[in-house]
Amino acid sequence: MSIQVEHPAGGYKKLFETVEELSSPLTAHVTGRIPLWLTGSLLRCGPGLFEVGSEPFYHLFDGQALLHKFDFKEGHVTYHRRFIRTDAYVRAMTEKRIVITEFGTCAFPDPCKNIFSRFFSYFRGVEVTDNALVNVYPVGEDYYACTETNFITKINPETLETIKQVDLCNYVSVNGATAHPHIENDGTVYNIGNCFGKNFSIAYNIVKIPPLQADKEDPISKSEIVVQFPCSDRFKPSYVHSFGLTPNYIVFVETPVKINLFKFLSSWSLWGANYMDCFESNETMGVWLHIADKKRKKYLNNKYRTSPFNLFHHINTYEDNGFLIVDLCCWKGFEFVYNYLYLANLRENWEEVKKNARKAPQPEVRRYVLPLNIDKADTGKNLITLPNTTATAILCSEETIWLEPEVLFSGPRQAFEFPQINYQKYCGKPYTYAYGLGLNHFVPDRLCKLNVKTKETWVWQEPDSYPSEPIFVSHPDALEEDDGVVLSVVVSPGAGQKPAYLLILNAKDLSEVARAEVEINIPVTFHGLFKKS
């Protein structure tokens, strides 16, 4: 990866500024030549409103959800955006204050109410946010924006209008679900969320939503729990942002970042707290890796253990001759990385941003190899017999398998994050290339391509330019894994530049193919997808 770049001008602060939605799409100015085969829409979610009246949101994952769309047709591009009409957004706009508690911001009772009304409003129970700012994904013929609670929001991908809120609790037993479901080529959706299992203890359920059937009924109404993972702590589930899926196995990585449910239910209801207040780290747990047989719908009680890390994004998982290969974007240690993503930190001047990031867990791309066939006679031995990996799996005397990873990429305070692959063809299969957003002390300032076999990297980077998660779009006649383009939304506040643009790169070498510039700022976006025409 390229050398570290400095950002003394602080242009990254534009990522965290409130913007207005658009009444109609804008025509973008295209330089270069957009491939004619690239037709469809890039849909992305992120925060677009960072304060309500005089009340600020405090955390990166608090701002109200803004849905973005870049349309591609015959070499032309338009840009549109609208706020998602969630309950959190509509009530905030109506009451001109923050009404529903967000990830790192507490909502307090209406100050206009008398003291008795305000007191009793604390006892209404936990009001969970539906602020769908993290991702968008398809279910059948429909599209849903999501956060990580039990609420998802159905949207119109053409007009960006909000259609309705859906509560997953009405269909399956989960307290929430991740923003990174897996979608198989037939349209089947898998996701994971924590739940109350036997004896009121916490567990993790895998949810399966079938593809659209001939009866055209909403697939969500046919959701089912297919397998359950146990929890290492009876009353403290781990934070889960993604999981691994292959044709035959489901992989769940249980990290030491825990949600204290007693704190969640008591302090929130009684005196006010937010989600961030309810996280804590188990400093002795390390990381537990769990697997389940997907086809037999059975949990496999292999005890995989390793040293502590934070995990938000799986890159890919696949099977290889009796082993599971699990590639992850890790952050070393047990301290919660989100502690460093408060907006006050991210909006600091460059030297302060660097100082804060130096205290945080450090990033590393890792490959773990999980043996599936365990012979107790091999106690004390490395069970991995695959060539071309330095990862190890030692069978310990207590029948646990201690894992040490192969490092695929490591750079001090230089993260390879928000990973993407040629998902449609290579998810759950052996692959070669991953694309990622390069974070420089948490500031996104480059796009990266990683060869996971040779560890070779390619980088796109320009001064005063702050890209988003790269989205890979395969060429319709692709012959190789990386035949296609990479799309990224770039904020460019530097002198002489348009405020933002959609960047199109050749997926082979990250050379620029074209860009589509707009005259308005675009705030940070987290995740999204390319919807082909």
Curated annotation (Swiss-Prot):
Tissue and organ expression note: Retinal pigment epithelium specific.
Compartment(s): Cytoplasm; Cell membrane; Microsome membrane
Family that this chain belongs to: Belongs to the carotenoid oxygenase family.
Annotated positions of the N6-acetyllysine modification: 113
Enzyme Commission no: 3.1.1.64, 5.3.3.22
Residue positions, PTM Phosphothreonine: 101, 105
Primary location class: cytoplasm
Modified residues (Phosphoserine): 117
UniProt superkingdom: Eukaryota
Membrane topology: Lipid-anchor
Protein known as: Retinoid isomerohydrolase
Phosphoprotein in keyword set: yes
Listed GO CC annotations: endoplasmic reticulum membrane; membrane; plasma membrane
Cofactor dependence: Fe(2+)
Residues bearing a lipid moiety (S-palmitoyl cysteine): 112, 231, 329-330
UniProt record, GO biological process: retinal metabolic process; retinoid metabolic process; visual perception; zeaxanthin biosynthetic process
GO molecular function: all-trans-retinyl-ester hydrolase, 11-cis retinol forming activity; all-trans-retinyl-palmitate hydrolase, 11-cis retinol forming activity; beta-carotene 15,15'-dioxygenase activity; cardiolipin binding; isomerase activity; metal ion binding; phosphatidylcholine binding; phosphatidylserine binding
InterPro entries referenced in this protein's UniProt entry, alphabetically: Carotenoid_Oase
Subunit structure: Interacts with MYO7A; this mediates light-dependent intracellular transport of RPE65.
Swiss-Prot/TrEMBL keywords: Acetylation, Cell membrane, Cytoplasm, Endoplasmic reticulum, Hydrolase, Iron, Isomerase, Lipid metabolism, Lipoprotein, Membrane, Metal-binding, Microsome, Palmitate, Phosphoprotein, Sensory transduction, Vision
Post-translational modification: Palmitoylation by LRAT regulates ligand binding specificity; the palmitoylated form (membrane form) specifically binds all-trans-retinyl-palmitate, while the soluble unpalmitoylated form binds all-trans-retinol (vitamin A).
Gene responsible for this protein: RPE65
Modified residues (N-acetylserine): 2
Cofactor notes: Binds 1 Fe(2+) ion per subunit.
